[in-house]
């Protein structure tokens, strides 16, 4: 007996027009801001962008230009956009490298290690995930200042190398691995680290891809934390750098829009690269759950 929730053979869709219109409206609501952002980034006049905002003219450009994208690289010596972009890439790569390693190691130990109080630790992690990050910003900032790590890459990377959410996601995947696979590796003389590195990680690519996407987007979009821990352009990421286009006397809408498009592009590329694994992981988790 089929368990497919879609339309079964012999049945017809009773409301095809309603479904089509609903999907079209939802898609339009989602895509419209992105389209508006791209169109505004192609307009040469920042005053035109502000004047047309809120009207249908905002979704059309008569004389498109890529000059805005060139201008953000040479906007001002006080706003080195190219440096901000490089900083964001460095922070992203360091965070992904450490986050994927430490979160997966912790998940493996919780799933297969002989750890006393494992249930209590899992409960504590879920509780910590519920706590808003904003509530621990000031204590964490104080720790970074006392360690002398503020205004650098370390302060923007180290706090995100461990996350209750990602440990729990990977724990769920690791705990579903058949016991026979683990026992076979033990019989072959593999150490716990070798089992983790050579057996579990290769078969966990869908789950790791999911964590990489979520962690990458979270890191790339960080604003409050880097705003608090950075004082110089040397380590400031692109999310904070864009705020420099909004001055007290004037707002460079054209440059801000172009910079926002540049900031948005890597997130889309990251998802497209890992899209297959991400979808497979979600489906697999749903079936196992």
Each model region followed by its residue ranges:
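A structural signal for multi-pass alpha-helical bundles of membrane permease subunits
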Residues: 7-11, 15-289
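Short, intrinsically disordered terminal tails adjacent to the first/last structured region
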Residues: 1-5
